[in-house]
Amino acid sequence: MENISYDALEKIGYKGYLLPKDAPEKVLQFGEGNFLRAFVDRFFDMGNEATGWNGKIVMVQPISGAFGFADGINAQDDLYTVLVRGKENGNTVDESRVISACSRCINPYREADYRAMMEVAVSDDLEIIVSNTTEAGIAYDPSCKADDMPPASFPAKLVQVLHTRWAAGKPGVIVLACELIDHNGEELLRIMNQYVSDWGWEDEFSQWMANDCTVCTTLVDTIVPGRIRDPKEAAAVAERLGYEDPFLAVREPFQMWGIQGDESLKERLPFVKAGLPGVFVTPDVTPYKKRKVRILNGAHTAFVPGSWVAGFDIVRDCMHDETIRGFMNTMLYDEVIPTLAADLDVEDCKAFAAAVENRFDNPFIDHALLSICLNSTAKWRARDLPTLKDYVAETGNLPKCLSTSLATLIAFYTQELVAREGDGLHLRRADGTEYTAQDDAFVLDFYAAHAGVDDAQLVHDVLTNEQMWGEDLTQIAGLEEFVVNALAVVRAEGVKQAFANAQS
């Protein structure tokens, strides 16, 4: 069976959408990973089909090495397949799309590819630059120099590209930063301006970046597991498709891409102009970040540690348990969403929460609870504590589900102690399964030192630990007593009974 290519697809009589190979290169993309290809490039591909934008993407590998990737994907005409697999509106989704939006992949650490990148920089066709260079990518490296070919850091590469474009008298571009850090576009622009200062470049160039370019902060949300790891399943998929594709990527159906900017972007971005679901332009992505953190991430952190203690191992199984699913939904709809009403449309939040349940019930992803439990103390502080405090401030009452989640979090760290070693706290849950709780060292040391302490004292010491929470949680009226009582139920009757009580 042949690898995917334009010729291979023609041979098998492929009838789907394909952008011609010679379409103009309108996008320069820093990053070539599964996320960009399955999420961002799929948006461009569908935007091309819907609007006739007719733009190809040049992928740039942002770090040295891995030359085999560029050579491999170029050998198959930069075509690849995205499988969308999961649950949507309660229905199982398993569909494929050939992505034809990419023209080539270059690695600027090869001299010819560096020159090719700079040729794209001054192209009249270039309109948009996209990046996802991981959380570590938007960082300042003082060793970068203006004449490096290329500089090591991504912001230095990008400012070098933009300076070359400005010097050639070309118009500005839109920059869409997709890295998973807060205010990604603003931070990227700040670091680029630092290089302009370091390198003594012209004030006129800084003004061009500020006035002629649009550097956007964006917020992305989808799960991209990447590739199919089971060889038998991969072979079955290839048989179904009619070709081999070593660069196939898998993702879930849910997609959300919030782009911070003005109304003009709606006409300039083909996927927004097409009205594709899940992508939108907004003056401020901050409320949507809050929605994601408090609903999606907050739900995980609230029910997962307790569900592990109850004997569950993967997220999907939790969604098939009426008590756990009910606990999560009661928390989201009765406790979390009401606190978001000042910033967000409540009906949108409810739709987002409904999508969360579908995402957690994905039949194609075995999402291990224990992996989600990493650093749960800091996660609960960032994701769930603000909602608890907002709820108390707005209603004068304790949110029962969120308060119970604190009790089950304590239970997660205080199962039978096996040992405190290295970077973990080794514990044994009731069914005999041994596990390692991983968190900040001070958290693990605290719980190891409290092994055998009675629960009333334990809860008091946890809630008054300002290193954990940044404040004394016993100052929240009634919380200490509630958590002591909920933890007593967990110890005597199990987590599921505590979850059930919180819903009554």
For each predicted feature, which ranges?
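Substrate/ligand-engaging "lid" and interaction regions
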Residues: 1-504
